[in-house]
Each structure stands twice: as C-alpha cells, then as structure tokens.
Amino acid sequence: MARVTVEDCVERVPNRFELVLLAAQRARGLSRGEELTVDRDNDKNPVVALREIADQTIVLEQIRSDLVRSLARAPEPEPADEEVMDLIPTEQNIFGLQDVSAEEEASHGTAGMSAEELEAAIEAELGGRARR
C-alpha cells in the first residue's frame, strides 16, 4: 500500500473521528518505542499507524483501552517555576520603584502643605522654577 487514505481504514473503523483518535494514540505508542507490525517504508508514525489499522495488524480494543486510560488520567499539577512566582502578587513593589504611602508622605512633611507650597516643593525638587 503506497499511500494510506482514510478510505482504507473506514472499513475497520467506520467513525472517522474515532479513527483519528485511534491512529494518533497508536502513533504516540510508536513514538514511545512500541513494536511495529508493518514495515516502516520510511513513513512517519501517523502513516504507519494508519497502515496498521488498514492491514488489521493491531488489536483496536487494546488501542481503545490505552486511549481511554490516557484520557482518564488527570495530569499532575506542574510546580510553579520562578518566572510564574514573579507574577504572583506580593507585598513588595514589583517594579522596583519607591512606594509612596501615607506614612512616607507624612514623614516628608508634605501632609500639611497647601497646594501652592506642594507645587513649589515639587518644582524645587525637579530643579525648575515655581510658576507664580
């Protein structure tokens, strides 16, 4: 069989969607090192899997049970790596900028300033002239 088409396999697995699932499961098994039942002929694993299904050289019930087992298994949660931990909110300022809080404002003496005095202090801090 030079080329495998879905029509070659439909007689064995009438549902095309199930055929795709079974062939993909078998191809994953071949990638894990399971034994071939047909000659590879320089074909890739999905094509070999379809050829095995078409030639009826594999037991489909075994592939179905492997498929169900792989889908029923809950994946293990991945441990949070350092990059993900950096995205989790913390008490620290993540941007490395100075936090300005009410306590710090009070310690700088800006709490009792009027708007004009505050503007003048900002201009002086920035090296500019206060507008009047």
UniProtKB/Swiss-Prot annotation:
Promotes RNA polymerase assembly. Latches the N- and C-terminal regions of the beta' subunit thereby facilitating its interaction with the beta and alpha subunits. Pfam families: RNA_pol_Rpb6. It comes from the Bacteria. Keywords: DNA-directed RNA polymerase, Nucleotidyltransferase, Transcription, Transferase. It comes from Gluconacetobacter diazotrophicus (strain ATCC 49037 / DSM 5601 / CCUG 37298 / CIP 103539 / LMG 7603 / PAl5). GO terms for cellular component: DNA-directed RNA polymerase complex. It catalyses: RNA(n) + a ribonucleoside 5'-triphosphate = RNA(n+1) + diphosphate. This is DNA-directed RNA polymerase subunit omega.
